[in-house]
């Protein structure tokens, strides 16, 4: 049994070798000759999986170690009798922590408290729900918009997108990309929406590039609209609009979900799905794969305020470390993918062990996802 895996899937060789012969290959472009004798294909979002790639190939199963699936033609796979699995929620925590890192940086730069802001969350799936929960731990008001969930009668106080645009100081997108249909998200943030945002609003896109109309956004910024912008995803990736990058406050190369934990979850989820598919079901404990974190432990004295939270968050991950490299190489062919391929190891907040002498600080940090304990000062 031959299993092709994307060379940038951590732990893929280690895990899938339990099931058969493993061949690690580039994801973009994928070497199609390797598909001629392969039984399974494990990809990331950079690989377009469709009839033109797999027609006439012996592939029986495709797994994507990503939450999103718009790079996979699921309808054709089903028609072709090819098994499929994604990794929903695998990188949700990472994306939430990316958003926090960005917001805390902007808050420090511009001198505002997040408690004074209302956050509109568009798309309330694995990422949106977790983001809402962490914001509410800190007492930050959130507004939710998710028409599919609202129409299904899912639990939640869902509002219209127009209401979020009217009332939110921060608008952050966490939707799939639907190019048509009743829940179309292609250019959901179009020129009309962007122009309607509150003066001084913050716009964040960490889902799919085409959810925000990049041309319209650049037009509005060029005309001087007072707007802070955080973009992790871009229309036309791996190409991007260099002029837009120059205008945004934070620009990164589609790495919001790139924690070691998130990548490992993606790999283990598709590994478990494939092992079940072939009748050799196996389960993997994530903590048996992950290395010890860079920071063993730190001590926090006193209560948790926004500047202290910012220091803790940026100790684990400061979004500016990914903004600067992209600006240096933007526009050079191949460099966008190279930044992603050679991405420095990044951990989640749970990797940081925080000893607090303040009980309320320890409680808040635990609810936020840190590994925190309370030890009263002596």
Curated annotation (Swiss-Prot):
Q: Which UniProt keywords apply?
A: Cytoplasm, NAD, Oxidoreductase, Pyridoxine biosynthesis
Which reactions fall under this protein's catalytic activity? Answer: 4-phospho-D-erythronate + NAD(+) = (R)-3-hydroxy-2-oxo-4-phosphooxybutanoate + NADH + H(+)
Q: Which GO terms describe its molecular function?
A: 4-phosphoerythronate dehydrogenase activity; NAD binding; protein dimerization activity
Which amino acids does the record list as binding substrate?
45, 66, 258
Q: Name a single GO cellular component.
A: cytosol
The subcellular localization recorded is: Cytoplasm
Q: What class of enzyme is it?
A: oxidoreductase
| Parts forming coiled coils | none
Q: Where is the active site?
A: 208, 237, 254
Matching entries from Pfam families are given as:
2-Hacid_dh, 2-Hacid_dh_C, DUF3410
Give the Enzyme Commission number. Answer: 1.1.1.290
Q: Where are the transmembrane segments?
A: none
User: Can you tell me which residues bind NAD(+)?
Assistant: 146, 175, 232, 257
Q: Does the keyword Glycosyltransferase apply?
A: no
Q: Which GO terms describe its biological process?
A: 'de novo' pyridoxal 5'-phosphate biosynthetic process; pyridoxine biosynthetic process
The UniProt entry, under SUPFAM superfamilies, shows: Formate/glycerate dehydrogenase catalytic domain-like, NAD(P)-binding Rossmann-fold domains
Tell me the CDD domains matching this sequence: ErythrP_dh (cd12158)
Query: Per its UniProt entry, which superkingdom is the organism in?
Result: Bacteria
**In UniProt terms, what function does this protein have?**
Catalyzes the oxidation of erythronate-4-phosphate to 3-hydroxy-2-oxo-4-phosphonooxybutanoate.
The record's note on quaternary structure and interaction partners says: Homodimer.
As for family, the record states: Belongs to the D-isomer specific 2-hydroxyacid dehydrogenase family. PdxB subfamily.
Q: What is this protein called?
A: Erythronate-4-phosphate dehydrogenase
**Name of the encoding gene:** pdxB
């Amino acid at each position: 049994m031959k299993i092709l895996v994307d060379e940038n899937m951590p732990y893929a060789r280690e895990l899938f070798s339990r099931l058969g012969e493993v061949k690690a290959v580039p994801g973009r472009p994928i070497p199609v000759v390797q598909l001629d004798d392969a039984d399974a294909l494990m990809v990331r979002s950079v690989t377009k999986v469709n009839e033109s790639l797999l027609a006439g190939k012996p592939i029986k199963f495709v797994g994507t170690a990503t939450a999103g699936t718009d790079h996979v033609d699921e309808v054709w796979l089903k028609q072709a009798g090819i098994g499929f699995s994604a990794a929903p929620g695998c990188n949700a925590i990472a994306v939430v922590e990316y958003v926090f890192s960005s917001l805390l940086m902007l808050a420090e730069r511009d001198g505002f408290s997040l408690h004074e802001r209302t956050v509109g969350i568009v798309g309330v799936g694995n990422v949106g729900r977790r983001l809402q929960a962490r914001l509410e731990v800190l007492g930050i008001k959130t507004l939710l918009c998710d028409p599919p969930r609202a129409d299904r009668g899912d639990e939640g106080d869902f509002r219209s997108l127009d209401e979020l645009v009217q009332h939110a100081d921060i608008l952050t997108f966490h939707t799939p990309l639907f190019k048509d249909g009743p829940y179309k998200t292609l250019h959901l943030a179009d020129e009309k929406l962007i122009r309607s945002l509150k003066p001084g609003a913050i716009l964040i896109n960490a889902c799919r590039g085409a959810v925000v109309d990049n041309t319209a956004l650049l037009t509005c910024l060029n005309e001087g609209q007072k707007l802070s912008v955080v973009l992790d995803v871009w229309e036309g990736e791996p190409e991007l609009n260099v002029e837009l990058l120059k205008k945004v406050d934070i620009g990164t190369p589609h790495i919001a979900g790139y924690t070691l934990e998130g990548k490992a979850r993606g790999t283990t989820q598709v590994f478990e799905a494939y092992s079940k598919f072939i009748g050799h079901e196996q389960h993997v404990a994530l903590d048996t794969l992950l290395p010890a974190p860079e920071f063993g432990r730190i001590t926090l004295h006193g209560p948790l305020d926004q500047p202290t939270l910012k220091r803790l968050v940026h100790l684990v991950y400061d979004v500016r470390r990914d903004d600067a490299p992209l600006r240096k190489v933007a526009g050079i062919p191949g460099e966008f993918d190279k930044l992603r391929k050679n991405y420095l190891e990044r951990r989640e907040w749970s990797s940081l062990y925080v000893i607090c002498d303040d009980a309320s600080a320890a409680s808040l940090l635990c609810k936020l996802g840190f590994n925190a304990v309370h030890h009263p000062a002596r």
